[in-house]
Amino acid sequence: MKSYLVGGAVRDALLGLPVKDKDWVVVGATPAEMLALGYQQVGKDFPVFLHPQTHEEYALARTERKSGQGYTGFTCYAAPDVTLEQDLQRRDLTINAIAQDDSGEFIDPYHGRDDLKARLLRHVSPAFNEDPLRVLRVARFAARYAHLGFRIAPETLSLMREMAENGELEHLTAERVWKETESALTTRNPQIYFLMLHECGALKVLFPEVDKLFGVPAPAKWHPEIDTGIHTLMTLAMAAMLSPAVDVRFAALCHDLGKGLTPPHLWPRHHGHGPAGVRLVAQVCERLRVPNDIRDLAKLVAEFHDLIHTFPILKPRTIVGLFDSIDAWRKPQRVEQIAITSEADVRGRTGFEAKDYPQARLLREAWEVARAVSPKEVVEAGFTGPAIREELTKRRIRAVAAWKEERCPQPAAEG
């Protein structure tokens, strides 16, 4: 019986990155022997145990054989005669198939260390194509390690393309797709995840509303990058620079879905694409069972991002109405979230990456002015029932109007 450190802990240590969780594989042991040593069994589908002191996971060496469709269609074989090399062979990427023994020596039968040096994400064996979830995992690793220069090996990308074409991805559950996507959205370069899915054809299967944006032109004057799919990824990249929050990043991804509905004879203009895209956002979120708070923000950003771009010329009544529409009084964080996504939209364009976005500052300022109007004072002034809300709205509009007169004087008529 011998234990080896495997997977992410070995990989990240070799990359000089912080090691979070340690996973171990045990060769030459039975479940009874593990239990006798005080390990606690937690795995249902295959034997996984928690160490009695460290509570780190120890899995018995195993092989997997395809026995059905999708990522759950596997039969596992765990027994003392399964070798370390056999266990490593079932893993997805060579960089995840490196083991280390207690003396510090590496066992690397699939040359994962060479691929780490070459910054390559390469599949271990042709059995890679038996698990469709691996397409998303590899795209996520590409996003996670993009800042280190990693790229997907051409032969692995080709295999991912075959998997997308043969219908295997359709067996993935909504929960698994969202879990991988949510994890990818937390990386430093989440746009790479969606770019890789687009390149291998998986985006068309899993996110057709986003995939449809590629090849849709926008006016070159406002969008030198022209392609709306490219703009979407640039906006997501900018949102990731401005905020670590998944809801903000997902909203950036979905902000222009409505442009995919524009009839080609109207290109490159997309009048009304924001409100038109709201139902597409809802469609994506329903299909993938996206959490409600993330869904709701994405719908609001789709509907109102273009309005924010015109903030300096908005009427005070429109500004207060915007705060009503986004339910800012109960969910004040939405003001900041929408400010960030609107800024990401403007700066997510070729040549505009460093552009100042005063609209975000004005939005924040106007919000502070409007929220400073006291509901308590309205009640104390004798207003009751629906009249409270009416008077509160009037006072907020007056306050915003006074602020706006000072901050954004308009010589011409407002729009």
Swiss-Prot record:
Additional remark text: A single active site specifically recognizes both ATP and CTP and is responsible for their addition.
Per the record, what are the reactions this protein catalyses? Answer: a tRNA precursor + 2 CTP + ATP = a tRNA with a 3' CCA end + 3 diphosphate; a tRNA with a 3' CCA end + 2 CTP + ATP = a tRNA with a 3' CCACCA end + 3 diphosphate
Q: Which residues form a coiled coil?
A: none
Its required cofactor(s), as named, are:
Mg(2+); Ni(2+)
Annotated HD domain ranges read 228-329
Q: How does it assemble?
A: Monomer. Can also form homodimers and oligomers.
The catalytic activity of this protein is classed by the Enzyme Commission as 2.7.7.72, 3.1.3.-, 3.1.4.-
Signal peptide as annotated in the record: none
**What's this protein's name?**
Multifunctional CCA protein
Gene Ontology molecular function: ATP binding; CCA tRNA nucleotidyltransferase activity; cyclic-nucleotide phosphodiesterase activity; magnesium ion binding; phosphatase activity; tRNA binding
Q: Which UniProt keywords apply?
A: ATP-binding, Hydrolase, Magnesium, Metal-binding, Multifunctional enzyme, Nickel, Nucleotide-binding, Nucleotidyltransferase, RNA repair, RNA-binding, Transferase, tRNA processing
Please state which protein family the record places this protein in: Belongs to the tRNA nucleotidyltransferase/poly(A) polymerase family. Bacterial CCA-adding enzyme type 1 subfamily.
What residues bind CTP, as annotated? 8, 11, 91, 137, 140
Q: Which InterPro entries match?
A: CCA_bact, HD/PDEase_dom, HD_domain, NT_sf, PolA_pol_head_dom, PolyA_RNA-bd, tRNA_CCA-adding_enzyme
Q: Which HAMAP family match?
A: CCA_bact_type1 (MF_01261), CCA_bact_type2 (MF_01262)
Q: Which gene encodes it?
A: cca
The note describing how and how many cofactors are bound reads: Magnesium is required for nucleotidyltransferase activity.
Task: List ligand-binding residues for ATP.
Answer: 8, 11, 91, 137, 140
Pfam hit, one: PolyA_pol
What does the UniProt function comment say about this protein?
Catalyzes the addition and repair of the essential 3'-terminal CCA sequence in tRNAs without using a nucleic acid template. Adds these three nucleotides in the order of C, C, and A to the tRNA nucleotide-73, using CTP and ATP as substrates and producing inorganic pyrophosphate. tRNA 3'-terminal CCA addition is required both for tRNA processing and repair. Also involved in tRNA surveillance by mediating tandem CCA addition to generate a CCACCA at the 3' terminus of unstable tRNAs. While stable tRNAs receive only 3'-terminal CCA, unstable tRNAs are marked with CCACCA and rapidly degraded.
- One Gene Ontology term from the biological process aspect of the record: RNA repair
Q: What is known of its domains?
A: Comprises two domains: an N-terminal domain containing the nucleotidyltransferase activity and a C-terminal HD domain associated with both phosphodiesterase and phosphatase activities.
On the tree of life, the source organism's domain of life is Bacteria
Give binding positions for Mg(2+).
21, 23
